[in-house]
């Protein structure tokens, strides 16, 4: 299954330290292998998104979260990454709207609005 990193996520990924990058890579590899069937603890549903299919990728041993959604072609689109340590609730409040907008933009540009 295809996993696509938006340019913003790619920049964030390459700025991670080696250990964080390895954890994120492992989670992305699992998502690529398992696709939509991958569940907790690696993937969980996100509440408060305007997209019912918004999820979070949860790399092992970290407080890193990557918000993503499956598009109509069943590709996992990684929309936003960050570390929510010490900022558990506010991280979602701040970042879900950004991920929603990026998902909307992806759907409009790649799929004619979804």
UniProtKB/Swiss-Prot annotation:
InterPro entries given in the database record: HigB-like
* Domain of life per record: Bacteria
Q: Which UniProt keywords apply?
A: Toxin-antitoxin system
Quote the Pfam families the UniProt record gives: Gp49 (PF05973)
Instruction: Name the family.
Output: Belongs to the mycobacterial HigB family.
Its biological function? Answer: Putative toxic component of a type II toxin-antitoxin (TA) system. Its cognate antitoxin would be HigA3. Not toxic upon expression in M.smegmatis.
What is the protein's given name?
Putative toxin HigB3
- Per the record, the gene is higB3
